[in-house]
Amino acid sequence: MVAASGYLRVVLPAPQSSIPWPPGEATWQGVVTATAESPRSRRVTLHLLPDAVVQATLKKDSLSSALAPGDALRFRAQIVAPANIDSLSRFDYAAWLRRHGVVGTAFVWDRWQRLSSAVADSLSARLPWTARMQLAASRWRHALSRRYAAAVPSDRDRAVLSALTLGDRHRLTRDIRTTYSNAGVAHLLALSGLHLGIIVTFLLLLLRPLGRTRPGRVSAYLLSLTVIWLFAYVTGLTLPTLRAATMFSLFCLFLLQNRQGNALNSLFLSAFLILVISPSQLLEVGFQLSFLSVLAILLVLPLRHHYAGLCRPLVWLADLLLMSCAAQVATAPLVAHCFGTLPVYFLVSNVVAVPCAYMLLGGALVFFVLSPVPAVQGFCGDGLAFLSGALNGWLEWVSSWPFGVVNWQPGPVETAMCYGLAVVLWWHYRQPDWRKLALCIVLAGGWAVSGILSL
């Protein structure tokens, strides 16, 4: 009954997801909450009073590029309900917008004007409290990303650095996204457990001296929890960050009580909490990819005992390859089903990209903490610029290799068979049985037949 009610809450549209917009053009006012760039236009997310979120398309020029979260606009356009642009694509863009709270779209182009700061503050104060919290986080994130402007001169490197450390992805161009996707490291541009895990690792290393006493240990874990959720809030409370923040919070609470928490239990508990708060996340591709990748990593971790006796650098490299391979293999069928492509050289890319992510996040933490000291900030900025440039150059080189991307888009039945085969293979590995092996052969044969029939 609980599962059925949750499913109905996901599938059936919410009452506020559809608004009867007036026909024809009208004049509107709203507060900018987010911006995103495309080659010839700029998409601006606006919060209209009393409580409606609209995505407006503006002409890309110096005026629209200067817009920031918290600005107020007056524009004239016809607002319509979200609709799909490409009818042949499997991706339901309109449903994706509605699940993210966008209830209308408008083609404004150049028929808009920026209102004064006083009007913007007045409109912002009348927004719902949740919208005000999100707006405050967006302003904070925008202010931090602007500090990179003086330190990192390259627009491309600065866009990647802002996305990787702050979750500010509005400067990412299609070329950057394509490069990272073809290289198999698109997950670096979306804040997730990897990024939060790096921050928690740095924190626990810095606070290790406090762990010698009970009060010091309590202070260290409470400070870690504060930083975890502050980072999640500033970066926009995205789904992967929420999942990772919940998991790391549970781990900290377990460690505080001198108990060894079960990672799988923490993963499923975080999924349960997220779905209770927002059941519509169940249909989000990001939710599915995020949890599949973490689940695969947790399931293959017991294989570490095969190489645990090696020297530490080799163990670290083997861990990196094992986790990267597990995450990519687990998400490959779903990625192919949704996007129609599969990267081939993801292991080669991750060997360099993940260590760079560690250094970039650590350097960004030092960069912001020591920003009052100009000399140190300048030194950190030069290091960040060099690392981000080296990372981009490496990934551009890897993505240019021949046969780097496989174009394959399985249907729903083939995708389900892939995951069924993976589950049975894992089951057979844990408890070998000829019947499970026979089931694997049947599933593999059915998958092959389904693929042939779909040609």
What is each model feature region?
Residues 2-187:
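Membrane-interface helix/helix-cap signal primarily in integral membrane proteins
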Residues 19-28, 40-48, 120, 126, ...:
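Juxtamembrane/interfacial segments around transmembrane helices
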Residues 30, 77, 164, 192, ...:
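Divalent metal-coordination and catalytic microenvironments
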Residues 37, 152-156, 239, 262, ...:
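Proline-centered turn/helix-capping motifs that create local helix->coil transitions or kinks
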Residues 63-78, 96-97, 102, 117-119, ...:
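Non-globular, low-confidence helical/coil segments that flank catalytic cores
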Residues 106, 173-346, 408-454:
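Hydrophobic alpha-helical transmembrane segments in multi-pass membrane proteins
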Residues 132-134, 138-139, 166-171, 235-240, ...:
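Hydrophobic alpha-helical transmembrane segments
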Residues 295-403:
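Alpha-helical transmembrane segments of multi-pass integral membrane proteins
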